[in-house]
């Protein structure tokens, strides 16, 4: 089995977005991922849609900081985001309300 990379995760995330759970949720989320395959990615949530890209987003409401491998595990359902946060594997800066809702907006592959 080939290793899943953050590029693959972010390319697919909009297809896993559950607009029915989003309601009026909106925000710009920045991801700062370190280690092998690390880099910066973003997700914009607005009007019941999500779009993703590589690089930095303007005016992030939320920044998530993690090792790239750990984030891939979170995104693919192998690591619980709350457990990752509590153990220090996931750091959160910004809108905690958006952070708490974020994981529920995307179904797991």
Label every model-predicted segment.
Residues 1-109:
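Feature captures hydrophobic
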């Amino acid at each position: 089995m080939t290793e899943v990379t953050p590029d693959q995760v972010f390319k697919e995330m909009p297809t896993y977005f559950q607009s029915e759970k989003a309601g009026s949720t909106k925000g710009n989320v920045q991801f700062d991922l370190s280690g092998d395959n690390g880099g910066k990615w973003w997700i914009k949530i607005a009007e019941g849609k999500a779009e993703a890209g590589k690089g930095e987003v303007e005016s992030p409401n939320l920044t998530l900081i993690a090792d790239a491998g750990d984030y891939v595990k979170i995104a693919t359902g192998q690591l619980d985001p709350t457990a990752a946060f509590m153990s220090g594997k996931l750091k959160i800066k910004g809108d905690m309300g958006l952070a708490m809702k974020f994981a529920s907006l995307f179904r797991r592959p």
